[in-house]
Amino acid sequence: MLSHELIERINFLARKAKNEGLTEEEQRERQSLREQYLKGFRQNMLNELKGIKIVNEEGKDITPAKLKALKKKNNVKLN
């Protein structure tokens, strides 16, 4: 989950980098926080996609096979 504190710290370091620069330790921290943020974002996006079913105008399921396979692998019900 993407915590408010994580985002606040990333934003603080971004402002500091723009205004006065970062120490090497802060640069490493910023990189680590960015990686954590991206990992959480990707996981949240994947969870959202797992819950999606795509249908055409006639109501026929046209969900891509790759997404169906992912849902099946993770035991997600296709509505």
From Swiss-Prot:
Gene Ontology cellular-component terms listed: cytoplasm
**Principal place where this protein is found?**
cytoplasm
| InterPro entries xref list | DUF896 (IPR009242)
Q: Which UniProt keywords apply?
A: Cytoplasm
Q: Does the keyword S-adenosyl-L-methionine apply?
A: no
Q: Which domain of life is it from?
A: Bacteria
Q: Does the keyword Cytoplasm apply?
A: yes
Family matches, as Pfam families: DUF896 (PF05979)
Localization, per the record, is:
Cytoplasm
Q: Which Gene3D superfamilies match?
A: Helix hairpin bin (1.10.287.540)
The record's similarity note reads: Belongs to the UPF0291 family.
Its name, as the record gives it, is: UPF0291 protein Bcer98_2342
